């Protein structure tokens, strides 16, 4: 037991030293661990600070991005709303355009149908117009042919009465005569001539002008132009003034109206004697020219239209039968062709070369210079167309060939008391011998005067013819004049038709200028032109006397069957006869058919008035 006591001590000392070493080692580990913990804590704190700063930055960036996103989102929303609005507008416009397109398509189809229908109607109308134009042209030609046949018919003595005409045609005739300044015959004068209408007036009413021709519209103005030009440049004949004659054709058989519209007396003062130069012929007397110049108004005796460029008139009588254009017509009427001038000059030479019969002109001092003999009738029948011309010598008379009977209007002798067979034969004979003859030929014939110093009025003839004779003076002792009833009735009819010598009456103005040196006397029964015979049928004939006033003795006739219209006495001491140039004597061209038509018209009128 003692031995055991020492051992626990030593064991206790050994255990405490080992524990001391273990405690120091643990103390060291504990300090090292504490260092590591502080380092880690410090590091963690740094990391936490960095994390906080980073999170703060990210939060700021996030807010900024959020704001930008919001802005972009708003923009997109506005853009989307605008787009939707535009889509709606576009849809509406598209719908509207579609509807308009549909409407226009329908209208286009409807208008296409209408165009097709209108084209068909236009084609039908064109065909109808063409047919109507052809029918109208045929009707116009037929009407003009009827009017021409009416003027050229053989019934020259036919008197048309207003009461026998249709009612509508009566109105047309009345309007035509009122328009052109004439009137129907008065039943108070002579009942046999009352209610009668001249054939030429009926023909004028029936005739239809060509719508494509301007000649009917321009003929009046061109005729007036020619009249003024002839009165100004060539102081000679002129168209008559309306106051010179009666207002209608009734002057020839209405002696009761002789005091109305009478021409002025010979005693009227004359202010311009030389205006009417060579009215009757180159042998006409000065006093006669003075008296005729006094019968016209002052306006016609003055050169009122100096330098007025006038054109030759174009006849409207054949306007509806004209197949040429207006340019060709005016070109033909502007000047004489070479062939016509040659024919005219040849005619003058042949006519002037003929000799008058010595028995007829032997006692006339005015024809002392003329030759001795006249050609045979066969030679006279070969006379060219233009028989009457102006003598180039003052003392030489007109030559009038024997063929002039065939050249005068047929009605002048168709009313004579002879068998109808002879009249028909004469008509057939003259139809083949017509020449360019105007009514101025008839109007140019002068009659022996029955009373000296009286005005040249157409009523002077009617006073004798219907009133029981005139003066008892010898026709061979009275001066010639232009008081022929043919001349007066022609001038009156020219105004009654209202054309002022424009429709073919100026086809031969040389006969107006030449005047009427050809007197009608009963002594020349064998002369070319048979005269008028009254209803008594005594057989007296009024031949063509180829001498001037007082040139040859003639038998006296006091009965009212002798035609003795008064004229104006004149003396050859005033001024010498004038000489006309060929241009004055033949200023008109291309009038063969026109002159014939006008001559037939006037001849029918004379037959109606003097029947």
UniProtKB/Swiss-Prot annotation:
Membrane association type: Peripheral membrane protein
Ranges of biased composition (kind: Basic and acidic residues): 554-563
Coarse class of the protein's main subcellular location: cytoplasm
Subcellular localization: Cytoplasm; Membrane
One GO BP annotation of this record: evoked excitatory postsynaptic potential
Cell cycle as UniProt keyword: no
GO cellular component: cytosol; dendrite; glutamatergic synapse; membrane; neuronal cell body; nucleus; postsynapse; presynapse
Tissue expression remark: Brain-specific. Expressed in neurons and rather enriched at synaptic junctions.
Entry-annotated residues carrying Phosphoserine: 219, 248, 265, 284, 364, 391, 474, 484, 494, 496, 519, 521, 525, 571, 581
InterPro entries assigned to the protein according to its UniProt record, in alphabetical order: Tjap1/BEGAIN (IPR043441)
Region (Disordered): 520-611
Positions of post-translational Phosphothreonine modification: 268
Assembly information from the UniProt record: Interacts with DLG4 and DLGAP1 and forms a ternary complex.
Protein task: May sustain the structure of the postsynaptic density (PSD).
Record's protein name: Brain-enriched guanylate kinase-associated protein
Gene: Begain
């Amino acid at each position: 037991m003692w031995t055991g006591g020492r051992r626990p001590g030593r064991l206790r000392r050994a255990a405490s030293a080992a524990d001391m070493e273990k405690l120091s080692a643990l103390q060291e580990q504990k300090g090292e661990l504490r260092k590591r913990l502080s380092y880690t804590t410090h590091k963690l704190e740094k990391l936490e600070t960095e994390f906080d700063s980073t999170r703060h930055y990210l939060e700021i960036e996030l807010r900024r991005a959020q704001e930008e996103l919001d802005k972009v989102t708003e923009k997109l929303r506005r853009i989307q709303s605008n787009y939707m609005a535009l889509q709606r507008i576009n849809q509406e416009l598209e719908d509207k355009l579609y509807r308009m397109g549909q409407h226009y398509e329908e209208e286009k189809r409807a208008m296409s149908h209408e165009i097709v229908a209108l084209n068909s109607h236009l084609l039908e109308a064109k065909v109808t117009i063409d047919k109507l134009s052809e029918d109208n042209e045929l009707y116009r030609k037929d009407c003009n042919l009827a009017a021409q046949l009416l003027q050229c018919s053989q019934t020259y003595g036919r008197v048309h009465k207003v009461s026998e005409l249709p009612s509508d045609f009566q109105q047309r005739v009345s309007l035509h005569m009122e328009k052109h300044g004439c009137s129907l015959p008065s039943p108070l004068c002579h009942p046999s001539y009352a209610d009668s209408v001249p054939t030429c007036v009926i023909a004028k009413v029936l005739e239809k002008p060509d719508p494509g021709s301007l000649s009917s519209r321009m003929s009046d103005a061109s005729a007036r132009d020619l009249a003024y030009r002839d009165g100004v440049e060539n102081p000679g004949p002129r168209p008559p003034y309306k106051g010179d004659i009666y207002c209608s054709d009734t002057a020839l058989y209405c002696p009761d109206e002789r005091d109305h519209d009478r021409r002025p007396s010979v005693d009227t003062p004359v202010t311009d004697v030389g205006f009417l130069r060579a009215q009757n012929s180159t042998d006409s007397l000065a006093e006669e020219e003075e008296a005729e110049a006094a019968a016209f108004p002052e306006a016609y005796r003055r050169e009122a239209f100096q330098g007025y460029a006038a054109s030759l008139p174009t006849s409207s009588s054949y306007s509806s039968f004209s197949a040429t254009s207006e340019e060709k017509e005016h070109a033909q009427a502007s000047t004489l062709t070479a062939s016509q001038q040659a024919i005219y000059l040849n005619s003058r030479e042949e006519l002037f070369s003929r000799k008058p019969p010595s028995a007829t002109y032997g006692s006339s001092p005015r024809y002392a210079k003329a030759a001795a003999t006249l050609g045979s009738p066969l030679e006279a029948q070969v006379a060219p167309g233009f028989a009457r011309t102006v003598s180039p010598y003052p003392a030489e008379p007109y030559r009038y060939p024997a063929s002039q009977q065939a050249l005068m209007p047929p009605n002048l002798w168709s009313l004579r008391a002879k068998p109808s067979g002879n009249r028909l034969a004469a008509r057939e004979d003259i139809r083949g011998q017509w020449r360019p003859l105007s009514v101025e030929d008839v109007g140019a014939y002068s009659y022996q005067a029955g009373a000296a110093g009286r005005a040249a009025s157409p009523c002077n003839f009617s006073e004798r013819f219907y009133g029981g004779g005139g003066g008892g003076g010898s026709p061979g002792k009275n001066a010639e004049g232009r008081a022929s009833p043919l001349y007066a009735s022609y001038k009156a009819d020219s105004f009654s038709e209202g054309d002022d010598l424009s429709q073919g009456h100026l086809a031969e103005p040389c006969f107006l200028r030449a005047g009427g040196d050809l007197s009608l006397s009963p002594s020349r029964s064998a002369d070319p032109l048979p005269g008028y015979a009254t209803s008594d049928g005594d057989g007296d004939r009024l031949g063509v006397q180829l001498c001037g006033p007082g040139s040859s003795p003639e038998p006296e006739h006091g009965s009212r069957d002798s035609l003795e219209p008064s004229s104006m006495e004149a003396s050859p001491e005033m001024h010498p006869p004038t000489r006309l140039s060929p241009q004055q004597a033949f200023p008109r061209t291309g009038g063969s058919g026109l002159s014939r038509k006008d001559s037939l018209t006037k001849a029918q009128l004379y037959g109606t008035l003097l029947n």
